[in-house]
Regions:
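An amphipathic, aromatic/His-enriched active-site/gating alpha helix that lines ligand/cofactor pockets
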Residues: 1-20, 57-72, 90-129
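Conserved small-residue-rich
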Residues: 34-78
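Surface-exposed beta-loop interaction hotspot
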Residues: 8-49
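Short, conserved secondary-structure transition motifs
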Residues: 21-23, 77-82, 122-133
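Short, well-ordered beta-strand segments in beta-rich or mixed alpha/beta enzyme
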Residues: 1-2, 34-43, 75-105, 139-141
Length: 141
């Protein structure tokens, strides 16, 4: 199913990409947990997609068990020859993201192999603030 988006008159849509979920998400609900969500866009060769999915699946239990983090979704471009993937991961905060750059050995091996199969990657970190989490934020104003 395609979703139609509307934009203000002064916003121009330059391109769109359709993706299908792979192993996750397990549910298709809007995310509501406050924290850091990193959107990691991958360019890959189409014949590497299945191995990247398997490597991710193998690494996630150890990775998630070692840090306050949870993989939200791994998506693949909805074409016959996919060359783009999107990984979305939740982190409690940026400190956890920084700590997770040094995962346990078995997760690290899978991530290193996944990196070898990746032509390039562009991670974008975002923060989701929910009204109930406002009291936990520190203002530097």
């Amino acid at each position: 199913t395609q979703t139609s988006l509307s934009f203000p008159d002064d916003v121009q849509l330059l391109s769109t990409h359709l993706f299908n979920p792979t192993l996750r998400p397990l549910d298709h609900q809007a995310r509501t947990r406050a924290g850091i969500y990193v959107f990691r866009w991958f360019s890959v060769l189409p014949d590497a997609v299945d191995e990247i999915i398997q490597l991710s699946y193998n690494a996630w239990p150890t990775f998630e068990g070692s840090f306050e983090t949870e993989v939200q979704g791994l998506f693949v471009e909805a074409t016959g020859q996919p060359s783009e993937m999107l990984l979305i991961t939740w982190y409690k905060n940026l400190s956890v993201w920084e700590e997770s750059r040094h995962p346990p050995e078995n997760a690290r091996e899978s991530f290193l192999r996944r990196h070898q199969l990746t032509l390039n990657a562009k991670p974008i970190a975002t923060m989701l603030n929910m009204p109930e989490s406002q009291s936990q934020l520190v203002s530097h104003a």
